[in-house]
């Protein structure tokens, strides 16, 4: 498990989480809320977003990282959007499930 708060392990690869207002994405879209750089293993989240939106965007970008590390290089953005929105809601509706799994299932 990564020691630093801004590190996230995905399929054995360590991604760095960076929260900043400006980041250069592959298409330099200034309207992006987040971006997952697979080569550098960095997940960017736009700093000016609300805390709730940052969490939602993090789950979205983590979904991209998970699919990429699982070998899905071409990803359907609509599928990633739908899946990450639902997963974000599951986390909100079940706030203790992750805490439970960390302390009870280990």
Predicted regions and their residues:
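Metalloprotease/metallohydrolase-associated module, dominated by Zn2+-dependent proteases
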Residues: 1-52, 69-106
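Active-site recognition of the HExxH zinc-binding catalytic motif
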Residues: 56-68
């Amino acid at each position: 498990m990564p020691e630093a708060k801004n590190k996230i392990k995905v399929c054995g690869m360590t991604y760095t989480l960076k929260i900043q207002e400006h980041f250069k994405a592959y298409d330099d879209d200034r309207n992006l809320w987040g971006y997952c750089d697979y080569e550098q293993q960095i997940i960017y989240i736009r700093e000016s977003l609300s805390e709730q939106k940052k969490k939602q965007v993090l789950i979205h970008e983590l979904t991209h990282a998970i699919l990429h590390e699982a070998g899905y290089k071409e990803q359907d953005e609509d599928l990633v959007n739908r899946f990450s929105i639902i997963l974000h809601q599951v986390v909100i509706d079940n706030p203790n499930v992750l805490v439970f799994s960390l302390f009870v299932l280990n």
